[in-house]
Each structure stands twice: as C-alpha cells, then as structure tokens.
A protein has these predicted regions:
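Active-site-adjacent loop/helix segments that line or gate small-molecule/cofactor pockets in enzymes
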Residues: 2-42
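Short, hydrophobic/aliphatic alpha-helical segments
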Residues: 4-12, 48-54, 104-105
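Short amphipathic alpha-helical surface micro-motifs
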Residues: 5-7, 28-30, 50, 95-97, ...
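N-proximal short alpha-helices
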Residues: 18-22, 48-49, 72, 76, ...
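Short active-site-proximal "capping" loops at secondary-structure junctions
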Residues: 30, 45, 64-66
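Active-site and channel-lining beta-strand-loop segments
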Residues: 37-58
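Glycine-rich loop-to-alpha-helix module at the N-terminal edge of alpha/beta enzyme cores
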Residues: 55-138
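Substrate-binding/gating loop at the entrance of the active-site cleft, primarily
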Residues: 142-143
C-alpha cells in the first residue's frame, strides 16, 4: 500500500474502517473537516507531530496523558524495563498488589481496589456494583 498523509489517509481509512478510525469518539470531521491532521507520527510532553513533521500544541491533551504529558521519560523507562522482563503471561504480577495498596492509601474510603483492562470492562464492573449495592436491576447510565 502506498504511504498516504493526513486527510488522504483519513479518506482512505473511511473506505475500509467504519468511521475511518477504530474508536467511536475520535473522528476528525468532528473537529475540522478536510483539514484536521487526523494522524500523528510522534508525541512528546504537550506537543504532537503530524505525518509531515508539523509540530502542534495538543490542546486536547488526550485522555490521561495530560497529567504527565506524552512520552514521559520516567514512565517510558519503567515500561521498557518491564517489557524486557516479559509482561504478557496468564500469571499475576506483584505490582498490581503494590498499586492497589497505593490506591487504597490515597482513598481512605476504599478498603479494596480492583483494576480493569479498559473502559468497557470498568463500566460493566461499575454496573454490577451498582446493582449489588442498590438491589435494583436497572441502572441509569450516561456516557
């Protein structure tokens, strides 16, 4: 496949991916149709670079990365260290216990912590907890 840039890549993507992207919320035409730089080559701190090398200040700051910025050196170092150790098994890693303890220490109202792999799983868990606590089957949800 020929390498495409920006809007041309996005237009092509829309022919093979419904909506042009794999996430429901990140469609370029929602922001600036035909001009929005839909794809980025790299990101560091609060900046992103498009496929042509143009640098932008990311005013959206993504979801979650706004706390530390993109490509945080300390985070990258820790992630790479753990990837090299082998990070994909069916077994549990001890770090989840240490992280759970930190979460509980920061939230005195919590006596336990549970982690999920993504938003959908977190929502499903929240709904189960709501049903258990309220003894009601229906749960109002907006989002």
């Amino acid at each position: 496949m020929k390498k495409l840039n920006g809007i041309n890549l996005y237009k092509y993507a829309k022919t093979i991916i419904p909506g042009g992207v794999t996430l429901f919320s990140k469609r370029s035409e929602l922001h600036l149709p035909d001009e929005w730089p839909a794809y980025f080559d790299k990101a560091k701190k609060i900046n992103v670079w498009d496929l042509k090398g143009n640098k932008y200040l990311d005013m959206f700051c993504a979801v979650g990365t706004s706390v530390l910025g993109y490509g945080n050196d300390n985070v990258n170092k820790s992630v790479l260290k753990n990837i090299k150790k082998g990070n994909l098994t069916t077994l549990n890693c001890p770090e989840e216990v240490y992280l759970a303890k930190k979460v509980i220490d920061h939230h005195p109202w919590a006596s336990m912590a549970k982690f999920t792999r993504g938003g959908g799983e977190a929502n499903a868990l929240a709904i189960r907890i709501a049903r258990l606590c309220t003894k009601k089957k229906n749960v109002a949800f907006c989002g």
